[in-house]
Every structure is written in C-alpha cells, then in structure tokens.
Design a protein with these regions (language model features):
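Pre-Walker A-like glycine/lysine-rich segment at the N-terminus of P-loop NTPase domains
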Residues: 1-51, 55-73
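Phosphate-coordinating catalytic segments in nucleotide- and nucleic-acid-processing enzymes
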Residues: 4, 50-302, 313, 397-426
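Phosphate-binding P-loop
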Residues: 17-23, 309-314, 342-345
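Walker A/P-loop NTP-binding motif
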Residues: 43-49, 308-312, 340-342
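C-terminal lobe/lid and adjacent interdomain/linker elements of RecA-like ASCE P-loop ATPase modules
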Residues: 74-77, 333-426
C-alpha cells in the first residue's frame, strides 16, 4: 500500500510542494482548481512510464494520460526547475533477506524518487530502509552509484545490483548462483519481490477519471478477448468495460450487487447483449433490459468506478475522481459505505477527490460508530496560496469530528441556511 506521496514543482505545486500520507481511505477536498486531480496525475505519470519501459526519455503522453510536455507540467512554466515525485511503499515479511550479506531487514520501506527535467530528461534514485538504517541506495547522476552493489548468500552465490535508466525501475540484478536449492530459490524470490515493490504498487493502482461512462449504445467486440483498459481515454475505457462485462459474468454479477447496495435498485442485474461484432452493456430486470447508454446517468457514471474497485488486487490503490457524480444524496451516503467495505474487508486502499459533504459525512460517521478508526480515514484540504497550492491534513477524532471544523467545505450550506432563517423573520 502507498505510504506517502511527495510532489514538488508539478503544475500548481511549487518547490515546497505537498506530501500526502494515505490511509485506508483518503479524501481530498478543496475548491475547483486547488490541485486535487494533479495528485492523481503525478501517480499516473509514474505508472505510465513504469509500464511502457522507455529508457532515457520520460513519457508525458501515453495510455494513462496526455499532459503535453515538460513545459506544460512544470510549475509556472519555469523550465529551468525540476519536477520531483517521490513515493514510499512499505514491504514486509521477506525473511530470506536476512540471509544476505550484508543483511537486509525483512520489513522496511522502499523510497523511490524521480526528478523530471526539460527535454524529456530525468534522473531517479531509491533507497531500501527502515527506521534504523539504509540497506540499499541507488543514485543516478553523471555516473550511477549503488551502495552496496553486491550481496552474497549461501555458498558462493552472489547478487550484483545495477542502476537502470528505466523510469520506475531504478535497479536490476545479476545473479551468480553456485548451487540450486530450495533455500536459494526462496532467497532469490524474496529479493525479486523486494526489487519489484514499486512496479507492483504502480501496476496494480487503478484510476477512475472524472470523464467516464458509456456514451454509445454498443461497442466493438475485442478479437483477442476482454482486457481492462486504464487511462483517461473515455472511449477506450468504455469499450473495454463493455467487453469485460460480456466475458466475465462473475465480475458483472459482483458489480451489479454493489450497485444495488448504492442505488437500492432491487433485483436488477448488469448484463450484455450481443449483435454481430458489437456488444451492448445493459441493466436487466427479469426479461426486460435497458442499455446503459439510456439508463440513469448516475448509474452510468457509477459502473466504471465500481469495476475498478471490484477488480483491483488486495492492497492496491483505487483512486476515484468525483465518485458522487449525478448521484442522489442518499446514494452518495450509501456509496461511502461501500468504500468502507472495500477498505476493511478487501484491504483495498481507496482515495477520492470529492465535493460531496454526503460522502465525507458518511465516512466520518463510520469513525463515530467505530466501524473505522480515526487513523483509517485521512482527510486533506487543498487550497490556493497565490499562484501555488497547499495541502493540509485535517485531524479526525474518535467521535468522527474534524478538529477545527470544516467551515471552508461547508460554508455555502451555512451561509444559505443563515439566509433562509433570516428571511423567515423579516
């Protein structure tokens, strides 16, 4: 799970930057244009580059998102500066690491940092560490530095660590193995799991964009089978979703059940209809069906987010922009309850951007009822400060209260209620 994210000189964030420490559920609130989506985009950029395996040239445009160029993302277009994106991801229960010489702790944190520069250039670094010491450090400057660059184990077996120029994959290993044994295989497996910590975190992360849903009656059937499509391309995502619903009735059934919990939609089911080389996603009630294109727009918008939540791996980050889109307040509150279920029962890390007081209040209610612990819910308020944006974590107490209140988030309701009361006594 993602332990922390730091972003500097990226879009609205200046050199001071922001640091987010996600919990089981993390809520980002703030006015329009305060940088909430930029936090997701920073992570998507890392995911995009770690998966495309380009060496030496950072990709700002790809399957995840299209941001233009370095000049489009550097704060205030100050191209002499560098963007910094850094993530901390914990690893745990890798006991064979302690058989290495020098020893590496079985539990620790993998810190990865990338610095973006003009001309699609970048440098990256990483450390494997715990609270007491650093076990491995990789720095890429004019000449890569790896400390230590070699580990031994068993009798004569060695691992050489080398720095790479692949974004998101800062190091690789070369193995010299003297003998084959079960213990050696277990040691190598733990080493590979350690070195893949960042790649696994990024590759399993799911991002549900604000622009989503089915905008056609039917979609072309994939010739090579259904596959999920990440990224912010609404057409590609909706086509992939339509195919996934058709080929994976188990996923369609679970998504349908979750939607019923949110909307109170009775015994309706998520299914599909095939016509030639086209597939039409539908909601069914008995023998009757309605294409999702013609369904309630809130339902249309809800399905992509719910598919991301259902199909994500345990421990994966699922980041959803504006999950409340077109939903009734009661449905928004019920949706917050499903977020709690995914976080607690399926151990998925849920992160939201939202303007919905109903979602936030429902999550705070989960803390008040002891369903969530205060540390399970992280609430960050993003706000403008001149030409930059800041992020402030709002403390949640055991009663589900935000210490200091939520005036900035709730002030419109407060003002309008005040106006209503005042008008009553004119």
């Amino acid at each position: 799970m993602l332990q922390s994210l730091t972003v500097r000189n990226f879009k609205l964030f200046d050199e001071q930057g922001i640091t987010i420490a996600p919990s089981k559920i993390t809520v980002l609130i703030g006015a329009n244009g305060s940088g909430k989506s930029s936090i997701f985009q920073a992570l998507q950029l890392l995911k995009q580059n770690a998966e495309t395996v380009h060496t030496g040239a950072f990709q700002y445009n790809g399957h995840e998102l299209t941001l233009g160029s370095f000049a489009d993302v550097i704060h205030n277009q100050a191209t002499e500066q560098q963007v910094e994106i850094s993530i901390n991801v914990p690893y745990e229960n890798l006991p064979r690491l302690e058989y290495l010489t020098p020893r590496v702790s079985r539990n620790g944190v993998y810190t990865y940092t990338i610095n973006l520069m003009t001309g699609n250039n970048y440098s990256q670094s990483c450390t494997i560490h715990d609270d007491h010491q650093t076990y491995i450090a990789v720095k890429q400057r004019r000449r890569p530095e790896v400390t230590p660059d070699e580990f031994s184990f068993a009798e004569g077996s060695k691992i050489k660590i080398e720095a790479t120029r692949i974004a998101g994959r800062p190091m690789e290993i070369r193995l010299t193995q003297s003998t084959d044994s079960h213990d050696n295989d277990a040691t190598i497996s733990d080493i590979l799991m350690l070195l893949s910590t960042i790649q696994v975190q990024l590759s399993t992360s799911r991002f549900t964009p604000a622009i989503r849903g089915f905008d056609q009656l039917n979609y072309e059937i994939f010739s090579s089978g259904a596959r999920f499509t990440d990224g912010n391309n609404a057409l590609l995502r909706s086509r992939a979703l339509a195919n996934l619903i058709a080929e994976r009735p188990d996923i369609a059934e679970e998504v349908g059940q979750k939607i019923q919990q949110v909307l109170g939609a009775g015994s309706r089911t998520l299914r599909n209809r095939l016509a030639g080389d086209r597939v039409s996603p539908e909601m069914g009630l008995g023998r009757k069906s309605i294409t999702l294109f013609n369904e309630a727009f809130g339902l249309n918008q809800l399905i992509p987010a719910m598919v991301d939540l259902v199909t994500a791996d345990q421990g994966a980050l699922v980041a959803i922009e504006e999950p409340e889109a077109y939903l009734h307040p009661r449905a928004q509150a019920a949706l917050a309850d499903t977020f709690v279920e995914f976080a607690l029962n399926e151990h998925k890390q849920v992160m939201l951007t939202t303007h919905s007081e109903h979602i936030l209040m429902s999550l705070l209610g989960g803390v008040a009822s002891s369903r969530l612990q205060p540390e399970d819910l992280a609430v960050y308020e993003l706000y403008r400060e001149g030409d930059t944006a800041r992020a402030k974590r709002l403390a949640v107490n055991q009663y589900g209260q935000i210490e200091g209140g939520l005036r900035e988030f709730m002030e419109v309701d407060i003002e309008k209620v005040g106006e209503l009361v005042a008008s009553r006594f004119r």
